[in-house]
């Protein structure tokens, strides 16, 4: 069958779990076609895939499956029927495969099988990047080879009340008007939609294109180790189309670099004061978002707000702090943070009134950017020890003093954040503490200066501070032929001036460009909102616009 998702009727009910070396005969009748005998290989269930072969052993259908949830399958069917169908089918397939950053083994194998089953040259390098090459369509062999690039991993964030295992479950998606969302988790449209678009082109037999080299990198979200470890000389293309921009009204031609500021140390503990009771104090409900693309929106940082409340409570009520667990991923603005605290039993009611006042102040300050902000207090088991009084004040003051948000706007590019910092993680328990910041900047010297200032802040309290994982920015080349081509094409297709821009986020183009300095690069994509948070969503109509723009670009790539 030529359709990507044929209707299949089984002659008997599939088994409840994986069964090796067992198959059943199926009968498929396509529209206007004779029925053909097919074989369903249940051994493939071990990898949560369904494979349908024809009588000569040729693969005619392959897709992820979930044997345990008809509701989930129904939702996936709804996604697969969206237009442009080639993208949504592959996005549904991809989102059925767990792919957390640094745990990409299954999605690497999935992509490797995808390329090999298409009969395309497929490579997996030592770090796990997947490269799939497809020859040009007839008549376009002389065109400049194009690298289509995206990353396989996704940010894994979920709401506190969502029971979900990113290591073993596929994303549960649903349609909400003109948007596709996930249920209580990140969606993985960043960068799953870009990967799906590349897959659709590789799998097509009716899309005109030059020689294609699809590069699927790993670990973009937590270190860009895939891009950093891609060897020079591997790629053969002269133009790179990065599909990791999150706004269809932006064509990205430059980006910021970044550096991790990793902080750690030890502290003394002291016995809990007699007559104390324990609580878990939590700041939650913040909007979060991408620590680069959303840093200018002024949203609250749970780590900073928690430190603010705790320090005020230490000074006014003499609370003890047994543990802090706040924030998470380095590239996500923290949405939640909590601390286990001790309060004198005689002061509990006064402390609750104090906390209500603090919550009211924060809700007023962040009413527009974080309308769901909440400060809660729940009873907890009394710990045996708390932080030394002197140190807890030092740690909280250091977190409060550490800059978060915009450090400097670009004096040259309107509305571009030039340098920023995200206080991403604060963890303290049992005499040890850690913190992490991600400092971004399009001017490397200024970026490193801000990181050094953060280092100095925490070294004042005796912390060990390491600046690690620095990666370069991507300098704009507005006169590059691909920029001019896509700029003119944008105006032709959409009747508006091409929105060329640089972004305050770390795209892999900066790193890849350091090994391929002559390669022309550009980045674009559909509208994705709320990336790196459970509010992530991708706009259906925007995916249609993006797909048309991508296909028209491929048709117009000039001769090499």
Region roles according to the model:
Residues 1-14, 23, 47:
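Low-acidity, Ser/Thr- and Arg-rich intrinsically disordered low-complexity segments
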Residues 76-178:
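Acidic/His- and Gly-rich active-site-bordering loop/insert found
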Residues 84-87, 411, 418-431, 438, ...:
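Zn-dependent metallopeptidase/amidohydrolase metal-coordination segment
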Residues 92, 96, 340, 374-386, ...:
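A short beta-alpha structural unit
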Residues 140-222, 227-238, 275-278, 389-392, ...:
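Active-site metal-coordination/substrate-binding segment of hydrolases
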Residues 212-302, 310, 314:
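Fold-level recognition of mixed alpha/beta catalytic cores in primary-metabolism enzymes, strongest
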Residues 233, 299-316, 343, 347-348, ...:
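His/Asp/Glu-rich mid-to-C-terminal helical/loop segments that flank catalytic regions of hydrolases
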Residues 254, 271-276, 295-325, 345-420, ...:
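Acidic-enriched catalytic cores of C-N bond-cleaving enzymes acting on peptides and small amides
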């Amino acid at each position: 069958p030529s359709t990507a998702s044929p209707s299949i009727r089984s002659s008997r009910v599939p088994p409840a779990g994986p069964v090796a070396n067992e198959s059943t005969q199926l009968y498929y009748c396509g529209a206007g076609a004779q029925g053909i005998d097919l074989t369903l290989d249940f051994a493939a269930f071990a990898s949560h895939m369904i494979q349908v072969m024809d009588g000569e052993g040729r693969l005619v259908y392959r897709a992820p499956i979930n044997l345990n949830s008809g509701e989930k399958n129904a939702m996936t069917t709804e996604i697969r029927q969206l237009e442009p169908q080639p993208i949504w089918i592959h996005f549904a397939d991809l989102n059925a495969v767990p792919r957390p950053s640094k745990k990409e083994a299954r999605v690497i194998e999935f992509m490797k099988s995808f390329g090999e089953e298409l009969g395309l040259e497929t490579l997996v390098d030592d770090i796990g990047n997947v490269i799939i090459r497809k020859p040009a369509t007839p008549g376009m062999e002389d065109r400049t080879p194009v690298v289509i690039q995206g990353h396989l991993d996704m940010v894994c964030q979920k709401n506190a009340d969502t029971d979900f295992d990113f290591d073993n479950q596929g994303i549960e998606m649903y349609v909400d008007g003109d948007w596709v969302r996930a249920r209580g988790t990140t969606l993985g449209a960043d960068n799953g939609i870009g990967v799906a678009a590349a897959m659709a082109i590789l799998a097509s037999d009716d899309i005109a294109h030059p020689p294609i080299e699809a590069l699927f990198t790993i670990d973009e979200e937590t270190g860009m180790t895939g891009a950093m470890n891609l060897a020079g000389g591997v790629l053969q293309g002269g133009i790179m189309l990065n599909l990791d921009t999150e706004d269809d009204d932006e064509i990205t031609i430059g980006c910021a670099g970044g550096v991790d500021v990793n902080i750690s140390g030890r502290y003394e503990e002291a016995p809990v004061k007699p007559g104390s009771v324990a609580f878990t104090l939590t700041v939650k409900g913040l909007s979060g978002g991408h620590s680069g693309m959303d840093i200018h929106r002024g949203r609250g940082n749970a780590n900073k707000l928690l430190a603010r409340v705790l320090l005020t409570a230490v000074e006014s009520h003499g609370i003890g702090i047994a543990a802090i667990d706040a924030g998470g991923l380095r590239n996500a603005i923290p949405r939640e943070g909590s601390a286990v605290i001790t309060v004198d039993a005689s002061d509990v009611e006064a402390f609750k009134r104090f906390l209500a006042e603090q919550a009211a102040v924060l809700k007023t300050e962040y009413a527009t950017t974080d309308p769901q902000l909440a400060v809660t207090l729940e009873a907890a088991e009394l710990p045996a020890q708390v932080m030394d009084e002197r140190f807890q004040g030092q740690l909280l003051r250091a977190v409060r003093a550490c800059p978060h948000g915009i450090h400097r706007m670009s004096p040259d590019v309107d509305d571009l954040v030039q340098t920023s910092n995200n206080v991403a993680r604060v963890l303290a328990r049992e005499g040890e503490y850690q913190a992490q910041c991600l400092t971004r900047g399009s001017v490397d010297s200024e970026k490193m200066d801000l990181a050094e200032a953060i280092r100095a802040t925490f070294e004042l309290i005796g912390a060990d501070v390491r600046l690690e994982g620095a990666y370069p920015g991507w300098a704009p080349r507005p006169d590059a032929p691909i920029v001019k081509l896509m700029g003119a094409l944008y105006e032709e297709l959409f009747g508006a001036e091409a929105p060329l821009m640089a972004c305050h986020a770390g795209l892999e183009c900066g790193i890849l460009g350091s090994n391929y300095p002559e390669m022309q690069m550009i980045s674009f994509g559909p509208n994705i909102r709320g990336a790196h948070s459970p509010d992530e969503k991708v706009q259906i109509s925007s995916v249609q616009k993006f797909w048309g723009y991508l296909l028209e670009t491929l048709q117009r790539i000039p001769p090499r």
